[in-house]
């Protein structure tokens, strides 16, 4: 019998993953009551919001980085924007972009309910069109939009990110599809799969970024922009 440490390790992790996540989430001290309400409403309406593990990690990053200006791509119903406004230790300004018309009024109402409407600015429309129009820099950017568009947003995102700033991208592992062969991925998901792989390669190989890919939730990347000579960025 092969008793090598690597044999069956993936199966062990797979079996234990759900129990581990449940245990880790049980240690969470929770959010404010309004965030709990908005989260439950989103879940009841099948609106995707950041997972519990990601919520904890985002709060940790905010406590460490204390960003003054935050850009979010992908508002949904405003849950993560409100969470960042609530748990950033400094009085930050948040700009968030949303393209789905049905969710925009819900997000606006949620900002008012949370008392964050003056702190959060919602830009309505396609991020691909809005990002090029932005000129002020940000010290924290959270990407949680259409996964197949991350690679297309990247040039403007990096232009807007301050040196020393943090870029967080959510849902980058695609429920494990990212490690599969191209042919093992369902045909309708192959374009997203290809683009996400390109995005992850760019994040981890650019000289002006230091990036970690972490198995938090459905996978996240955390990148810091560093100063390099112009001809060394690629």
Predicted regions and their residues:
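N-proximal short alpha-helices
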Residues: 11, 27-31, 80, 192
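A structure-centric signal for secondary-structure junctions around beta-strands
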Residues: 9, 32-35, 91, 217
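S-adenosylmethionine/decaboxylated-SAM
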Residues: 52-234
């Amino acid at each position: 019998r092969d008793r090598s440490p690597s044999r069956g390790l993936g199966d062990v992790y797979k079996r234990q993953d759900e129990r581990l996540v449940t245990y880790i989430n049980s240690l969470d001290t929770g959010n404010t009551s309004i965030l709990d309400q908005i989260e439950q409403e989103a879940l009841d309406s099948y609106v995707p919001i950041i997972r519990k593990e990601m919520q904890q990690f985002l709060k940790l990053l905010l406590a460490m980085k204390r960003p003054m200006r935050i850009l979010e791509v992908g508002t949904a119903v405003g849950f993560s924007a409100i969470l960042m406004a609530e748990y950033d230790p400094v009085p930050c300004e948040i700009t968030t972009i949303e393209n789905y018309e049905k969710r925009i009024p819900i997000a606006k109402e949620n900002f008012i309910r949370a008392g964050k409407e003056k702190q959060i600015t919602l830009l309505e429309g396609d991020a691909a069109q809005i990002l090029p129009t932005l000129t002020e820099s940000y010290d924290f950017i959270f990407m949680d939009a259409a996964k197949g568009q991350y690679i297309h947003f990247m040039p403007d995102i990096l232009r807007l990110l301050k040196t020393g700033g943090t870029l967080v991208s959510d849902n980058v592992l695609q429920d494990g599809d990212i490690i599969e062969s191209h042919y093992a991925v369902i045909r309708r998901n192959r374009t997203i799969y290809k683009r996400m792989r390109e995005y992850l390669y760019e994040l981890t190989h650019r000289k002006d970024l230091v990036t970690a890919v972490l198995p938090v939730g459905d996978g996240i990347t955390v990148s810091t922009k560093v100063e390099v000579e112009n001809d060394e960025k690629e």
